């Protein structure tokens, strides 16, 4: 987990939600343990305005949304693809070399700087499969 050596999460979304800081609530380490994806989201309706994402569970820096995407979400996502899903990624790469594959998603936003919409998981996976992971800090 970025900025938290030795700390693990059951999901990338768990990291994202756990490190989200609201005007009315700090981080929530319990989100790191959720495997079912139920009760994972933390919303402005319940906690108030998002003020940033903490740099790790013991961090003191708050990152604005785009920087949090670049420094927390994208490295976490890529780590999972390379370390937990490497066999599946290899299989997808091999299949895509033989024929077209279709990746479906609810969103199509592939622009990290477009903060009006969530990032597309399909776009992130496509970029990774193509060896075109362009997102850096």
Language model regions located:
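Charged, low-complexity intrinsically disordered segments
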Residues: 1-137
């Amino acid at each position: 987990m970025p900025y938290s050596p030795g700390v693990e999460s059951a999901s990338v979304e768990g990291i994202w939600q756990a490190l989200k800081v609201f005007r009315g609530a700090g981080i929530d380490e319990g989100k790191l343990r959720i495997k079912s994806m139920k009760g994972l989201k933390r919303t402005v309706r319940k906690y108030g305005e998002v003020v940033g994402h903490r740099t790790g569970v013991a961090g003191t820096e708050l990152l604005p949304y785009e920087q949090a995407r670049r420094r927390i979400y994208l490295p976490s996502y890529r780590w999972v693809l390379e370390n937990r899903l490497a066999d599946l990624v290899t299989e997808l790469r091999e299949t895509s070399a033989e024929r077209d594959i279709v990746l479906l998603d609810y969103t199509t936003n592939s622009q990290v700087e477009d903060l009006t919409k969530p990032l597309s998981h399909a776009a992130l996976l496509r970029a990774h499969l193509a060896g075109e992971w362009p997102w850096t800090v």
